[in-house]
């Protein structure tokens, strides 16, 4: 009987309209994405990058810790030894379609060579465009070096 009276007096509709009026005059919580962007957390894990030292040499020492720790097996590294005895990578590939953006590669790196940058807009129409080689990763690092360095500096005490 109570349900009949509620439906007779349009209780559900009145309740729904009251809820609509309650939120009608509050500020919007959505953003117009391509034109407006929300702030990104300092610990955001986006597109990968390889960093260089200030004098231009790449930081990666080919220890392969990032390749070993990657749970998705998205990283492939090949390395050669130089005349001075140091090791450097000849091939450093990341398959971004396999990557789960966990950040373990960044945590495992002893020299902060591989980092996850601030970019989240790197969609592609082909699978091959999402397999990043060493040159692409170094270009990403060069492009975002200031942002990456400040991000690592802010996060240093928590590492």
Swiss-Prot record:
Pfam families (alphabetical): Fer4_7 (PF12838)
Enzyme class name: translocase
Gene Ontology MF terms: 4 iron, 4 sulfur cluster binding; iron ion binding; NADH:ubiquinone reductase (non-electrogenic) activity; quinone binding
Binding positions ([4Fe-4S] cluster 2): 70, 99, 102, 105
Chain sites annotated for binding [4Fe-4S] cluster 1: 60, 63, 66, 109
Membrane topology term: Peripheral membrane protein
Family matches, as InterPro entries: 4Fe4S_Fe-S-bd (IPR017896), 4Fe4S_Fe_S_CS (IPR017900), NADH_quinone_OxRdtase_chainI (IPR010226)
Chain ranges of the 4Fe-4S ferredoxin-type domain: 51-80, 90-119
Cofactor-binding details, from the entry: Binds 2 [4Fe-4S] clusters per subunit.
Catalytic activity annotation: a quinone + NADH + 5 H(+)(in) = a quinol + NAD(+) + 4 H(+)(out)
Cofactors, names only: [4Fe-4S] cluster
Annotated GO CC locations: plasma membrane
Membrane-spanning residues: none
UniProt entry keywords in alphabetical sequence: 4Fe-4S, Cell inner membrane, Cell membrane, Iron, Iron-sulfur, Membrane, Metal-binding, NAD, Quinone, Repeat, Translocase, Ubiquinone
EC number(s) recorded for this UniProt protein: 7.1.1.-
GO biological process: aerobic respiration
Top-level taxon of origin: Bacteria
Disulfides per UniProt: none
Location within or outside the cell: Cell inner membrane
Protein family: Belongs to the complex I 23 kDa subunit family.
Biological function: NDH-1 shuttles electrons from NADH, via FMN and iron-sulfur (Fe-S) centers, to quinones in the respiratory chain. The immediate electron acceptor for the enzyme in this species is believed to be ubiquinone. Couples the redox reaction to proton translocation (for every two electrons transferred, four hydrogen ions are translocated across the cytoplasmic membrane), and thus conserves the redox energy in a proton gradient.
Subunit structure as annotated in this protein's UniProt entry: NDH-1 is composed of 14 different subunits. Subunits NuoA, H, J, K, L, M, N constitute the membrane sector of the complex.
Family matches, as PANTHER family: NADH DEHYDROGENASE [UBIQUINONE] IRON-SULFUR PROTEIN 8, MITOCHONDRIAL, NADH DEHYDROGENASE UBIQUINONE IRON-SULFUR PROTEIN 8, MITOCHONDRIAL
Protein name: NADH-quinone oxidoreductase subunit I
């Amino acid at each position: 009987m109570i349900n009949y009276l509620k439906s007779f007096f349009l209780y559900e509709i009145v309740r729904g309209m009251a809820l609509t009026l309650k939120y009608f005059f509050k500020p919007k919580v959505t953003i117009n994405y391509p034109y407006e962007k929300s702030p990104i957390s300092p610990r955001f894990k986006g597109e990968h990058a390889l960093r260089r030292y200030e004098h231009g040499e790449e930081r990666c020492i080919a220890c392969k810790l990032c390749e070993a720790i990657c749970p998705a097996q998205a990283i492939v590294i090949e390395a050669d030894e130089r005349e001075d005895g140091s090791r450097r990578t000849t091939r450093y590939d990341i398959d971004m379609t396999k990557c789960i953006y966990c950040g373990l590669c960044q945590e495992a790196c002893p020299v902060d060579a591989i980092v996850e940058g601030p970019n989240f807009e790197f969609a592609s129409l082909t699978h091959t465009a999402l397999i990043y080689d060493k040159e692409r990763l170094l270009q990403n690092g060069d492009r975002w070096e200031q942002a990456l360095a400040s991000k690592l500096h802010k996060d240093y005490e928590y590492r």
